[in-house]
Amino acid sequence: MQNNSRDLRLISFNKYVRPEIKEYKHKGYVLNGVNNSFYNYLTECYYGSTTHKAVCDTYINLIYGQGLVEKDGDVESAEWLTFLEIFSEEDQHRIISDFKIYGEFSAQVIPTRGKTLSKILHLEKSKVVPSVADDLGNITSYWYSKDWSKQWQQGYEPVEYPAMGHGKGNETEIYVGKPYNVGKEYFSDPDYLPVLPYAEFEQEVANYYLKYIKNGLSLGNIVNVPNSQHWSSEEKDKYEKKVKERLTGSDNANQVLISFNGADTSPSTIESIKNDYAHKQWDFLTVEARQQILTGHKATS
């Protein structure tokens, strides 16, 4: 008796794994996730979610307002001009941006040879990590790398700087500002932390729709391979690999389903999986994600 049962294999793509928030103690410093990756996750959510980015940008602009002002309105006074020379409006705005996006900020404090304040420069917080705290729980230094994912490569080696108040002479120091978070010794989470899954969801929905449209409004494809059920696992794996190489570029559909069929004289076929109601399926979730993002940011009115 002929066996016409099918061996089905599902190929999935573009699964994103959220980085684990974990403190890694290595060589005297602490990283916020593997290779300091949690900051990258926050950055991706910021740029990937339309609603989340709009709310963050609004808060940043509200916090900055018109910037710092001279209390007597004398913007030409020597003291005010000296202050702006030390701490520019651009650095002020960047520090506020880091504080909103990352929940903390860092600045490079540069003294003169006479130990007076010379310059306050913004340092992107994603590039600055604390040293391991001493026995009293004090963080006496910070480490800087242009890219922590490349910390072992030449030009990206971490450099240690004293924390503000711990430098000797005219050493450049680093100041990190962050609010108190329960259970957090080294890092402070942004105040919108519960928003992140919904921000990620908005990004994935946008990517889904884009790929859905580029793929001719198809959810994916079924590749029917006739007279292939008797193939060995090695032969099926080899065929599956070829299909992946040919059909699964970044602009293709979500999934490819390979069907290894029984005896059949028909040629191999590719069937498109259609869904005329795909846009309706995501309407509720899209609205819900937007509402949860606004709620998480306390921007409900």
Language model features: what each stretch is:
Residues 219-234, 256-301:
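Surface-exposed loop-to-helix/strand elements on domain peripheries
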Residues 1-57, 61-261:
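Structured, contiguous alpha/beta core segments that scaffold functional sites
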